[in-house]
Structures are given as C-alpha cells and as structure tokens.
UniProtKB/Swiss-Prot annotation:
The gene is thiG. Homotetramer. Forms heterodimers with either ThiH or ThiS. It comes from Pectobacterium atrosepticum (strain SCRI 1043 / ATCC BAA-672) (Erwinia carotovora subsp. atroseptica). GO terms for cellular component: cytoplasm. The lineage of its organism: Bacteria, Pseudomonadati, Pseudomonadota, Gammaproteobacteria, Enterobacterales. Belongs to the ThiG family. Gene3D superfamilies: Aldolase class I. Keywords: Cytoplasm, Schiff base, Thiamine biosynthesis, Transferase. 1-deoxy-D-xylulose 5-phosphate binds at G156, A182, G183, N204, T205. The active site is at K95 (schiff-base intermediate with dxp). This is Thiazole synthase.
Length: 261
C-alpha cells in the first residue's frame, strides 16, 4: 500500500503519459502497469472541456490524475499552471516540476521550495520533483509536501539509480513517502529502489519507448511488487566472507573415520 495524504493506493508504480506512439498504446500500457496515479502535462489537456482522447479514457479506467507543471521555469509560472490544472481538472493534487535547464531538465531547488510553500498554503497536495538532496527534501517535507520525488538520474536518461547514496539518506530521514522519479530505465532499477526502501517509483520513458510498451509495463508492475515484497521480507546482511549454506565438515569426517575402520 502507498499512502499519500488522504489517499491509499494499492500500486507503488506511478506512470506518465508522454512519448507513447499513440493514445491507444498509452492506455493499454497504463492498464497493464496497474498504476493508479498517472501524471500528465497541462499542455496535453483539452482545456475547453471537449472530447479529450487522453483524459476521458484515463478516467474511465479509474486512474487518479496527477497534473504536472512541466515547462515552468519559475515558481510563479508553476503556481499559475497549478491553479489552471485545479480549475480544468478539478483536482488539488499536483506534481510540481520546475526545470529551467532545457538540456538536462534538472529541477531548480530554490524555485521548487518557494512554489511548494505557496501551493501548500493554497490547499494543494504537492508532490515535488527534486534533486536527490537530503536537506532540500527535508525542507519540502517541513513546508507540507505530501511526498517528495527525488531523481535517480536525469529525466528520460534510463541510467538507473545514479544518486543511490543520497537516496538512502533521504529515505532514512523522511516522514513522508519517497517516490523515486526520473532515470529509471529497467524493471530491475525499480525493484532496486523499492528494496532500498523507497515507497514508490514513477516510470514513463522506459515504458513508452520500449519495443513492446504493454509488456514492459507489465514487467515494471511485477518488478515493483517484487521489490516491495523483498523489502518487507527483510534481506540478509551483506558480509565480506563466505558462509556455507550446507556445511559438509562433519559428514566428511564421519566418512573418513568409517573408511579407516
């Protein structure tokens, strides 16, 4: 179970709507993923309330929408986009994204914290995309964010958990859910994040650009379930020396003694 604010989700896998070849393929992949919370950029939404090829089918699947402020370069732009999303979609949930750097899409920590504080005051349930900075994540928690979404690697890079050491600190210190966002390129990366103690992961590119997005979505679903179950089960401690699972010393001595007789 993933508990965010006043909502309990049975899936720890969050997904996105970008980069899919067709809306139909996107919907099939999202359904296969089992995800219950899907993020989407406001620029993809039909603000006139007409027949939206993406929005309406998502709602029919019972998926909770998480609009994001992708494209915002400042706190003011993000707050404006958030208000627009709440008006257009009727939700106070928001994935806060502010990345002025168009090459690496790295989040602006100063503007993100500023916007988060304002949006929380306005009643939004804020899930900020941020760098894997333990101090920043703690500050975002303190201003009232419902979860933090530190990056594993740059958006869409498929590099996996390049920020592993910092993610461990964030997870250890957090009193709100930690959802690893960006850079997860394989189901094994997702399982690794859950085994580490992350509460969830958000995956988009790795599913959308796969040769078979539906199969990849299913693979991520299984990986997230496996990683979460492994964490709950409790993994054995690492050690630098061997530890035999089936000691044979006594058996060999018995055989030797029998032969001597």
């Amino acid at each position: 179970m993933l508990h965010i604010a006043d909502t309990i989700l049975t899936s720890r896998l969050l997904t996105g709507t970008g980069k899919f070849a067709t809306p139909e393929l996107m919907l099939a992949a999202l359904e296969a993923s089992g995800s219950q919370l899907v993020t989407m950029a406001m620029k993809r939404v039909d603000l006139n309330g007409g027949n939206d090829a993406i929005l309406a089918p998502l709602r029919q699947l019972g998926i909770k929408l998480l609009p994001n402020t992708s494209g915002a370069k400042t706190a003011d732009e993000a707050v404006f986009a958030a208000r627009l999303a709440r008006e257009a979609l009727g939700t106070h949930w928001l994935k806060l994204e502010i990345h002025p750097d168009v090459k690496y899409l790295l989040p602006d920590p100063i503007e993100t914290l500023k916007a988060a504080e304002q949006l929380v005051k306005e009643g939004f349930t804020v899930l900020p995309y941020c760098g894997a900075d333990p101090v920043l994540c703690k500050r975002l928690e303190e201003v009232g964010c419902a979860a933090v979404m530190p990056l594993g690697a740059p958006i869409g890079s498929n590099q996996g958990l390049q920020t592993r050491d910092f993610l461990r600190i964030i997870i250890e210190q957090a009193r709100i859910p930690v959802i690893v966002d960006a850079g997860i390129g394989a189901p094994s990366h997702a399982a690794d994040a859950l085994e580490m103690g992350a509460d969830g992961v958000l995956v988009n590119t790795a599913i959308a650009v796969a040769r078979d997005p539906v199969a990849m979505a299913r693979a991520f679903r299984l990986a997230v379930n496996a990683g979460g179950l492994a964490r709950q089960a409790g993994q054995g401690n690492k050690q630098f020396v061997a530890s035999a699972t089936s000691p044979l010393t006594g058996f060999l001595h018995q055989q030797t003694e029998g032969a001597e007789r």
